């Protein structure tokens, strides 16, 4: 048993920090985004579900734009380009399947940046 905040944090981009737990087949993350931070457009083979706990997060998924508020979630299919802007300070839960092996390394951003559009 472990607390998510006891996991070593990974800065994905400026203002975006994640705490990731890994199973054999999926990854769970608590992501904190500072207001104004931008997750640039990228894609990955993993299916992703983002559930917003706090704040307001504007996302573009494929060609559609969405504004997530607390309690809302979105499923991002495999290999679908997506990006986000934190309108307010945010806390979100992200899940990925299959597991994000690239997030298990000490530099999570390396694998992610390689897949950026």
Residue ranges of predicted features:
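Short strand-coil-strand connectors
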Residues: 24, 60-64
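Short acidic-glycine-tyrosine-enriched beta hairpin
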Residues: 63-78
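Short, conserved beta-strand element in jelly-roll/cupin
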Residues: 32-34, 44-59
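A cytosolic small-molecule/anion-sensing beta-strand core signal
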Residues: 53-54, 69-70, 88
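Conserved short histidine dyad/triad with adjacent acidic residue
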Residues: 14, 29-43
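Ligand-binding loop in jelly-roll beta-barrel domains
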Residues: 78-102
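A short, N-terminal "cap"/entry segment at the start of jelly-roll beta-barrel domains
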Residues: 1-25, 105-117
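Short beta-strand segments in beta-sandwich/barrel cores
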Residues: 28-29, 38-39, 55-60, 74
């Amino acid at each position: 048993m472990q607390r998510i905040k006891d996991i070593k944090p990974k800065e994905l981009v400026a203002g975006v920090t994640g705490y990731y737990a890994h199973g054999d087949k999926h990854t769970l993350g608590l992501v904190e985004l500072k207001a104004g931070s931008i997750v640039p457009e990228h894609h990955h083979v993993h299916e992703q579900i983002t559930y917003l706990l706090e704040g307001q997060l504007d996302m573009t998924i494929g060609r559609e734009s969405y504004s997530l508020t607390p309690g809302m979630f979105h499923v991002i299919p495999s290999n679908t380009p997506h990006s986000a802007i934190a309108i307010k300070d945010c806390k979100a839960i992200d899940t990925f399947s299959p597991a994000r092996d690239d997030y298990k390394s000490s530099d999570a951003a390396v694998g992610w940046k390689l897949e950026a559009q």
